[in-house]
Amino acid sequence: MVEEVQKHSVHTLVFRSLKRTHDMFVADNGKPVPLDEESHKRKMAIKLRNEYGPVLHMPTSKENLKEKVPQNASDSYGHKQYPANQGQEVEYLVTGTHPYPPGPGVALTADTKIQRMPSESAAQSLAVALPASQARADANRPVPAGGEYRHPGAPDRAQPAGAVVMEGSNAKNSALMAKKAPTMPKPQWHPPWKLYRVISGHLGWVRCIAVEPGNQWFVTGSADRTIKIWDLASGKLKLSLTGHISTVRGVIVSTRSPYLFSCGEDKQVKCWDLEYNKVIRHYHGHLSAVYGLDLHPTIDVLVTCSRDSTARIWDVRTKASVHTLSGHTNAVATVRCQAAEPQIITGSHDTTIRLWDLVAGKTRVTLTNHKKSVRAVVLHPRHYTFASGSPDNIKQWKFPDGSFIQNLSGHNAIINTLTVNSDGVLVSGADNGTMHLWDWRTGYNFQRVHAAVQPGSLDSESGIFACAFDQSESRLLTAEADKTIKVYKEDDTATEETHPVSWKPEIIKRKRF
């Protein structure tokens, strides 16, 4: 006789399963998970390689730091050393803070760790203990700066004032003279910019834009695979050039010859003769999409950057690849050239900026301050400085070694393009269609613009891919995702009274990396 199996509801079966599972693991409840040493070592090795791989080779300190300091002489900090008696240690007069910045790149040797950072009371007692003449002489001795040990990309550090001792009866009442708090300069007033023309004609995203040196016309490249030349004064289409088989990502007009250069996602770099409107040269070598290009201002050299993680230097006339600039670990998004050293600057999706030696074809400096992809770099036309843009952040740097100047925060979007004019107006354009205008010197954001998309486009097609000032710097052109080119000009009716600078100085502006 077959025994019938008792049937239970699904609810009861689930709870019984939960109880069996609980009884099985109740003994291990609350205990820490045992650490696997081998997997932990591998994880740390991978993390070190991924995050610190590009900066493994740090600058070394000078050899003279390893030499023994003679007696009756000043040490490498500029501090006076006194001869030691038998059984007595050498005492140091500390007149300032430690000259070596606490950053990477300074080797900790017997000389660099010999002194400790003095407290205010300790420095004051040392100054009181010495004769007035000796203390004054030592206090006035200049402390050598630690700039030569500064890691590339680190900000300049100002040395605080040293101990100053009064003469005569006030010798015992010496004190450390506090340095005056730094004052922030007031931003220069700039008139706001307003939209006055929208030019349509492309059938796809407008990805790049350039103005010709004569300021008569400008050229755009688009995702519709065409290059269009427009009259700058009227905004009318003059010419369309076809030849690329994919999105055109970069265009530039030569100042030395009647040539137009273009690059695209079809891996091609083309040279167009504008007298015949035909392609006369191809530059072959990139293995993937070419994202940008720039011409050297003084020699016939073209530089391109690509998704294949390299930038290439081309001889314009012979079409030969002079150098392949390798070192980036991800797509190179932007490249800029200048006549002074360093002559080539690249920004990449690997979050780094590299300054290159054009002659040797090697990296001079690698800047690792950005935390996200660097999609835009712009050089100031007058100052020896440049700016770089990544999502949510713009940074300013100083040539030739890439010293960090300041952050420009507030444009919370993916920044695709940067441009600056000689008056110090920096423009940043982002993928959400917003455009911010900044004062270059102070980093003050004086205007924010978000133009409406053209009728028939989606709001999500609001994005700025490229922007440029014309040669007179009176007009600003933007290439956008709604298939249009927008032209802005300064508001002639604006004054400092109608559009005042809404600026409040901070007591101390933090320099963040």
From Swiss-Prot:
Modified residue annotations for Phosphoserine: S119, S200, S390
Sites bearing N-acetylmethionine, chain numbering: M1
**InterPro entries (alphabetical):** G-protein_beta_WD-40_rep (IPR020472), Prp46/PLRG1-like (IPR045241), WD40/YVTN_repeat-like_dom_sf (IPR015943), WD40_repeat_CS (IPR019775), WD40_repeat_dom_sf (IPR036322), WD40_rpt (IPR001680)
One Pfam family it belongs to: WD40
Keyword annotations from UniProtKB, A to Z: Acetylation, mRNA processing, mRNA splicing, Nucleus, Phosphoprotein, Repeat, Spliceosome, WD repeat
Identify one Gene Ontology CC term for this UniProt entry.
nucleus
Q: Where in the cell is it found?
A: Nucleus; Nucleus speckle
Cysteines joined through disulfide linkages: none
- Taxonomy, superkingdom: Eukaryota
**Which parts are the WD repeats?**
201-240, 243-282, 285-324, 327-366, 369-409, 410-448, 459-498
Q: Which GO terms describe its biological process?
A: mRNA splicing, via spliceosome; positive regulation of G1/S transition of mitotic cell cycle; protein localization to nucleus
Q: Give the protein family.
A: Belongs to the WD repeat PRL1/PRL2 family.
User: How is the quaternary structure described?
Assistant: Identified in the spliceosome C complex. Component of the PRP19-CDC5L splicing complex composed of a core complex comprising a homotetramer of PRPF19, CDC5L, PLRG1 and BCAS2, and at least three less stably associated proteins CTNNBL1, CWC15 and HSPA8. Interacts (via its WD40 repeat domain) directly with CDC5L (via its C-terminal); the interaction is required for mRNA splicing but not for spliceosome assembly. Component of the minor spliceosome, which splices U12-type introns. Within this complex, interacts with CRIPT. Also interacts directly in the complex with BCAS2 and PRPF19.
Function text? Involved in pre-mRNA splicing as component of the spliceosome. Component of the PRP19-CDC5L complex that forms an integral part of the spliceosome and is required for activating pre-mRNA splicing. As a component of the minor spliceosome, involved in the splicing of U12-type introns in pre-mRNAs.
Indicate what this protein is called per its UniProt record.
Pleiotropic regulator 1
**Organism whose genome encodes this protein:** Bos taurus (Bovine)
